[in-house]
Amino acid sequence: MGAFTGKTVLILGGSRGIGAAIVRRFVTDGANVRFTYAGSKDAAKRLAQETGATAVFTDSADRDAVIDVVRKSGALDILVVNAGIGVFGEALELNADDIDRLFKINIHAPYHASVEAARQMPEGGRILIIGSVNGDRMPVAGMAAYAASKSALQGMARGLARDFGPRGITINVVQPGPIDTDANPANGPMRDMLHSLMAIKRHGQPEEVAGMVAWLAGPEASFVTGAMHTIDGAFGA
């Protein structure tokens, strides 16, 4: 019997990288898992076949679609919001429409998903939002909008923790540093610069982030809410 046997889990953004590792972790631990995808249909199909989880197409930039997928998931025990994008470049040169889409996916979707989930969660429900260490530290130029979107999650989680606490629901933010995914590979061009800023000079693995998520979703973290949990090899220290 797994740690999450009988639990219902929805993961927004679960087809690749950190999201896929979280899907695998909860399935391995016995949960009934649904996950969303947008641009990675083939990866989502493979993951669903591998794990038995259910894949659901959802554009996280569409507020109504986000609310709908949460609502149709029923009385969730655990919500994980991992969907996110990056828009990078000098602020004076970026397209305003791209920035609006970034904020819709990285800020609006986590907010609306969390609120809708809390409406139907039982006492003891868990909400985990995947943020970024860049919400605390931005050592390079060209990432202001991305950093702003991740910093916003901190205030959101602290405020929603106050609103959800009387319902017995916790909400926390997991803030990864450099993690070995296709978006930021361990052998990529940024490796040496990133590792020079870290005490543990390697990229983290998606499974390490999934492990932190699983702990925060479990019974030992029932008194933990409104907090930021950084997993970054001291990138932000």
From Swiss-Prot:
Statement: the UniProt record of this protein carries the keyword Flavoprotein: no
Annotated SMART domains: PKS_KR
Lineage: Bacteria, Pseudomonadati, Pseudomonadota, Gammaproteobacteria, Enterobacterales
Residues that bind substrate: 132
Annotated GO MF terms: cyclic-di-GMP binding; NADPH binding; oxidoreductase activity; protein homodimerization activity
Signal peptide positions on this chain: none
Name of the protein: Cyclic-di-GMP-binding biofilm dispersal mediator protein
CDD domains membership: SDR_c
Observed effect of gene inactivation: Mutant shows decreased biofilm dispersal. Deletion increases the cyclic-di GMP concentration in the cell.
Family per similarity comment: Belongs to the short-chain dehydrogenases/reductases (SDR) family.
NCBIfam families: PRK12742.1 (NF009383)
Swiss-Prot/TrEMBL induction comment: Expression is time dependent in biofilms and is controlled by BdcR.
Binding site for NAD(+): 10-34
Active site: 146 (proton acceptor)
Annotated PANTHER family: DEHYDROGENASE/REDUCTASE (SDR FAMILY) MEMBER 4, DEHYDROGENASE_REDUCTASE 4
Pfam families: adh_short_C2
Record's keyword terms, sorted: c-di-GMP
Domain of life: Bacteria
Single GO biological process annotation from the record: single-species biofilm formation
Bridged cysteine pairs (disulfide): none
Keyword Zinc: no
Stated role: Increases biofilm dispersal. Acts by binding directly to the signaling molecule cyclic-di-GMP, which decreases the intracellular concentration of cyclic-di-GMP and leads to biofilm dispersal. Also controls other biofilm-related phenotypes such as cell motility, cell size, cell aggregation and production of extracellular DNA and extracellular polysaccharides (EPS). Does not act as a phosphodiesterase.
